[in-house]
A protein has these predicted regions:
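PLD/PLD-like phosphodiesterase catalytic module centered on the HKD motif
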Residues: 1-172
């Protein structure tokens, strides 16, 4: 596995050719970009979500080019504060073409899932996302190992079968 920088990761998310799938398994994350916006939400303050526009533009470009972007979020219920906030800001990404689905953790107990969140790009490259206990991203590593690719593809598709589309999911 090869460690990559944030810039290299961003480039991979721009350059894939056909498909990107993203499996999220944690109940809380924290990025320097997200944390101030989550704090606004927690305080009941309005957020115009302008900070999401770059990602939404990238998503629209992918969709316009015929690519697909799917995200499955495995969540504990009742939702953590982070996931409640995440649910509240998902619509702009969905409007831009990302298919976001929610999976109550109890639905996936018998599915073998990799130990880290990941992106699988074009069924050819896995990017494993490593986090600290507090949910801050600490590393990104890539793999083209066929075993890793098969593990992630199988796990994602099995989770996806249990997933509830955003518009139908009722947060608990």
């Amino acid at each position: 596995m090869t460690s990559i920088s944030d810039d290299e990761f961003d480039q991979l998310l721009t350059d894939f050719e056909r498909t990107a799938v993203h499996l999220e398994t944690r109940d809380a994350y924290g990025t320097t970009v997200e944390l101030p916006h989550m704090a606004q939400w927690a305080a009941g303050e309005h957020d115009d979500l302008e900070w999401l526009q770059g990602w939404c533009a990238t998503l629209r470009n992918h969709i316009d080019a015929g690519r697909t972007v799917r995200r499955a979020r495995i969540v504990s219920e009742p939702l953590s504060n982070y996931q409640q906030w995440s649910y509240s800001i998902a619509q702009p990404m969905i409007d831009a073409g990302e298919d976001i689905r929610w999976v109550p953790r109890r639905r996936v107990s018998s599915i073998a899932i990799p130990g880290n969140d990941f992106y699988l790009l074009d069924n050819a490259l896995v990017v494993f996302l490593h986090y600290s206990g507090d949910g801050l991203g600490v590393a990104k590593v890539t793999s083209t190992d066929p075993h890793d690719i098969q593990l992630c593809r199988t796990a994602f598709e099995a989770v996806w079968q249990q997933a509830i589309p955003h518009r139908e999911y009722q947060p608990v």
